[in-house]
Amino acid sequence: MIFTLEALQADQGDCLLLHYGQPGGARVILIDGGPGGIYNRSLKPRLEELRGRQSQIALEMVIVSHIDDDHIHGIVDLVKQLKTVQEKGQTPLPYRIRTLWHNSFDKLIGRSNPAARNEGSGASAAALDAVVPAGIERESTLHVVLRCVGC
Protein backbone atom coordinates (compact mmCIF):
# COMPACT_ATOMS: atom_id res chain seq x y z
CA MET A 1 0.00 0.00 0.00
CA ILE A 2 1.26 3.46 -0.93
CA PHE A 3 0.68 6.65 1.09
CA THR A 4 1.28 10.16 -0.22
CA LEU A 5 0.48 13.36 1.67
CA GLU A 6 -0.07 16.39 -0.54
CA ALA A 7 -0.11 19.86 1.05
CA LEU A 8 -2.07 22.38 -1.00
CA GLN A 9 -1.33 26.11 -0.91
CA ALA A 10 -3.54 27.32 1.95
CA ASP A 11 -1.91 30.57 3.08
CA GLN A 12 -1.88 30.50 6.90
CA GLY A 13 -4.21 27.45 7.09
CA ASP A 14 -4.11 23.75 6.35
CA CYS A 15 -5.48 21.83 3.38
CA LEU A 16 -4.12 18.32 2.86
CA LEU A 17 -4.90 15.42 0.53
CA LEU A 18 -3.88 11.97 1.72
CA HIS A 19 -3.62 9.53 -1.19
CA TYR A 20 -3.48 5.84 -0.28
CA GLY A 21 -3.94 2.43 -1.87
CA GLN A 22 -2.51 0.62 -4.83
CA PRO A 23 -1.16 2.37 -7.94
CA GLY A 24 -3.99 3.00 -10.37
CA GLY A 25 -6.60 2.65 -7.63
CA ALA A 26 -5.53 5.22 -5.07
CA ARG A 27 -8.12 6.67 -2.71
CA VAL A 28 -8.24 10.20 -1.35
CA ILE A 29 -8.86 11.67 2.11
CA LEU A 30 -9.22 15.45 2.47
CA ILE A 31 -7.91 16.83 5.77
CA ASP A 32 -9.04 20.41 6.45
CA GLY A 33 -9.88 22.92 3.76
CA GLY A 34 -7.94 26.04 4.61
CA PRO A 35 -9.30 29.57 5.12
CA GLY A 36 -11.68 31.55 2.93
CA GLY A 37 -10.69 31.69 -0.74
CA ILE A 38 -8.61 28.50 -0.67
CA TYR A 39 -11.37 26.29 -2.03
CA ASN A 40 -11.62 28.24 -5.29
CA ARG A 41 -7.92 29.04 -5.52
CA SER A 42 -6.31 25.69 -4.60
CA LEU A 43 -8.62 22.88 -3.53
CA LYS A 44 -11.25 22.91 -6.28
CA PRO A 45 -8.69 23.07 -9.14
CA ARG A 46 -6.76 20.15 -7.60
CA LEU A 47 -9.91 18.07 -7.13
CA GLU A 48 -10.89 18.80 -10.74
CA GLU A 49 -7.42 17.70 -11.86
CA LEU A 50 -7.77 14.45 -9.91
CA ARG A 51 -11.26 13.89 -11.30
CA GLY A 52 -10.01 14.28 -14.87
CA ARG A 53 -12.60 12.99 -17.32
CA GLN A 54 -14.48 10.98 -14.72
CA SER A 55 -17.96 12.19 -13.88
CA GLN A 56 -17.20 11.99 -10.16
CA ILE A 57 -14.30 11.58 -7.74
CA ALA A 58 -14.82 9.87 -4.39
CA LEU A 59 -13.40 11.45 -1.27
CA GLU A 60 -13.26 8.49 1.09
CA MET A 61 -13.24 10.82 4.02
CA VAL A 62 -13.29 14.55 4.71
CA ILE A 63 -11.78 15.40 8.09
CA VAL A 64 -12.25 18.73 9.86
CA SER A 65 -9.59 18.71 12.59
CA HIS A 66 -11.13 21.66 14.42
CA ILE A 67 -13.40 24.59 13.69
CA ASP A 68 -10.92 27.44 13.33
CA ASP A 69 -11.53 29.34 10.10
CA ASP A 70 -8.10 28.48 8.69
CA HIS A 71 -9.08 24.78 8.73
CA ILE A 72 -12.84 24.68 8.07
CA HIS A 73 -13.72 27.44 5.61
CA GLY A 74 -12.65 25.55 2.48
CA ILE A 75 -14.69 22.52 3.60
CA VAL A 76 -17.75 24.75 4.09
CA ASP A 77 -17.25 26.11 0.56
CA LEU A 78 -16.91 22.57 -0.81
CA VAL A 79 -20.11 21.29 0.77
CA LYS A 80 -21.99 24.47 -0.19
CA GLN A 81 -21.07 23.80 -3.82
CA LEU A 82 -22.22 20.19 -3.54
CA LYS A 83 -25.47 21.28 -1.90
CA THR A 84 -26.12 23.81 -4.68
CA VAL A 85 -25.45 21.22 -7.39
CA GLN A 86 -27.71 18.74 -5.58
CA GLU A 87 -30.54 21.28 -5.22
CA LYS A 88 -30.37 22.01 -8.96
CA GLY A 89 -30.86 18.30 -9.59
CA GLN A 90 -27.55 17.96 -11.40
CA THR A 91 -26.14 14.46 -11.21
CA PRO A 92 -23.77 13.04 -10.52
CA LEU A 93 -22.20 15.37 -8.00
CA PRO A 94 -18.59 16.17 -9.01
CA TYR A 95 -17.30 14.89 -5.66
CA ARG A 96 -18.72 12.14 -3.51
CA ILE A 97 -17.94 12.41 0.19
CA ARG A 98 -18.32 8.99 1.76
CA THR A 99 -17.71 10.05 5.38
CA LEU A 100 -17.35 13.42 7.08
CA TRP A 101 -15.44 13.48 10.38
CA HIS A 102 -15.79 16.53 12.54
CA ASN A 103 -13.92 16.82 15.82
CA SER A 104 -16.70 17.48 18.33
CA PHE A 105 -15.37 15.87 21.50
CA ASP A 106 -16.57 18.68 23.80
CA LYS A 107 -20.05 18.51 22.31
CA LEU A 108 -20.18 14.75 22.87
CA ILE A 109 -19.36 14.98 26.55
CA GLY A 110 -21.48 18.07 27.13
CA ARG A 111 -18.60 20.36 27.93
CA SER A 112 -17.81 23.67 26.33
CA ASN A 113 -15.13 26.25 26.88
CA PRO A 114 -16.55 29.65 25.85
CA ALA A 115 -13.16 31.30 26.35
CA ALA A 116 -11.64 29.07 23.68
CA ARG A 117 -14.46 29.45 21.18
CA ASN A 118 -14.02 31.85 18.30
CA GLU A 119 -17.24 33.43 17.06
CA GLY A 120 -16.21 33.00 13.43
CA SER A 121 -15.27 29.39 14.03
CA GLY A 122 -18.62 28.64 15.64
CA ALA A 123 -20.37 30.21 12.70
CA SER A 124 -18.32 28.08 10.32
CA ALA A 125 -19.19 24.90 12.22
CA ALA A 126 -22.88 25.79 12.15
CA ALA A 127 -22.60 26.55 8.43
CA LEU A 128 -21.01 23.16 7.83
CA ASP A 129 -23.83 21.38 9.66
CA ALA A 130 -26.41 23.38 7.69
CA VAL A 131 -25.05 22.66 4.22
CA VAL A 132 -23.90 19.04 4.32
CA PRO A 133 -25.66 17.35 1.39
CA ALA A 134 -27.86 14.32 1.93
CA GLY A 135 -26.09 10.98 1.83
CA ILE A 136 -22.92 12.00 3.64
CA GLU A 137 -22.26 9.97 6.77
CA ARG A 138 -21.15 12.22 9.62
CA GLU A 139 -19.15 10.79 12.51
CA SER A 140 -17.28 12.45 15.30
CA THR A 141 -13.59 11.79 15.61
CA LEU A 142 -14.06 10.40 19.12
CA HIS A 143 -16.68 7.90 18.00
CA VAL A 144 -14.44 6.67 15.19
CA VAL A 145 -11.40 6.34 17.47
CA LEU A 146 -13.39 4.39 20.07
CA ARG A 147 -14.85 2.12 17.41
CA CYS A 148 -11.39 1.46 15.97
CA VAL A 149 -9.96 0.33 19.30
CA GLY A 150 -12.96 -1.87 20.04
CA CYS A 151 -14.58 0.14 22.84
Give the ranges of each region predicted by the language model.
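Conserved beta-strand hairpin/beta-sheet module of binuclear metal-dependent hydrolase folds
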Residues: M1-A58
